[in-house]
């Protein structure tokens, strides 16, 4: 069973990721950026997520990829590439 400190650290990392995702979403929606710039922002979010939660690429693809796909499709008419490469 995780310790209280481990649970607090997990919550801190989740909160940080939530902030990063929300800020990125707002930037894509509200800033005059093109698809390529938005795509780079999504790649940044994925890198940050994997830095916070190593080995959780599949989780990112299940939770956040569909959200960003909808967002990019709504704004630009494009979806994310199959793989978000560096």
How should these model regions be labeled?
Residues 2-35:
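N-terminal acidic leader/helix
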Residues 44, 49-86:
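Helix-rich interaction surfaces within compact, conserved domain-sized segments
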Residues 36-40:
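Short, solvent-exposed positions on alpha-helices
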């Amino acid at each position: 069973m995780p310790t209280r400190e481990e649970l607090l650290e997990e919550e801190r990392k989740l909160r940080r990721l939530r902030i990063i995702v929300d800020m990125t979403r707002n930037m894509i929606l509200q800033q005059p950026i093109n698809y390529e710039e938005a795509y780079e922002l999504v790649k940044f979010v994925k890198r940050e997520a994997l830095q916070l939660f190593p080995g959780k690429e599949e989780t990112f693809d299940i939770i956040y990829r569909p959200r960003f796909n909808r967002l990019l499709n709504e704004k630009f008419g494009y979806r994310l590439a199959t793989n978000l490469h560096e």
